[in-house]
Amino acid sequence: MASGKFITFEGIDGAGKTTHLQWFCERLQGRLAAAGRQVVVTREPGGTQLGEKLREILLNQPMDLETEALLMFAARREHLALVIEPALARGDWVVSDRFTDATFAYQGGGRGLPRDKLETLERWVQGGFQPDLTVLFDVAPQVASERRGAVRMPDKFESESDAFFSRTRAEYLRRAEEAPHRFAIVDATRSIPEIRQQLERVLAAL
């Protein structure tokens, strides 16, 4: 575990990924400490001063579908340039709550934006750069909806229908099927202790 790696957490809203991210990062940091490496914890959209401003807009303001995708990738370019790439160059590890798979799942699968348009933006913004590992928290939209209903006021995406999240989930699973070497799928319907057991296996494989 000496060289820097980029890990992403993905899943539909209500899958529980954010609940487990800090625990995962603390466990990972414990394993990296002896090598003098740090774990940089970040998120998308966001992670930078500009990215957080764009996040506030993206999560709360209605907008044209293509504008939404363009702003997502604009925030991502800033995130890569200011946070992710410098951290990896130092040999640190980066764990991000969402990355490009979320754009394909939400703007592509959920919103219906053509995949070729997203692929064009992906090539422009990140070239061939991809996460070393993507942990996908998979859960049925109905279960995720019940979880979302038990928390704070929902943002624009959290307020979407089960049908939207069914399309989003399907796109996540399709991407996982296309890149099985990169994805680790977590059964997010399980209890917190059971999910953490799954994450322990993910950590052991790093």
Curated annotation (Swiss-Prot):
Keywords: ATP-binding, Kinase, Nucleotide biosynthesis, Nucleotide-binding, Transferase. It is an enzyme of class 2 (transferase). CDD domains: TMPK. InterPro entries: P-loop_NTPase (IPR027417), Thymidylate_kin-like_dom (IPR039430), Thymidylate_kinase (IPR018094). One of its GO terms (molecular function) is dTMP kinase activity. Its EC number is 2.7.4.9. GO terms for biological process: dTDP biosynthetic process; dTTP biosynthetic process; dUDP biosynthetic process. HAMAP family: Thymidylate_kinase (MF_00165). Phosphorylation of dTMP to form dTDP in both de novo and salvage pathways of dTTP synthesis. This is Thymidylate kinase.
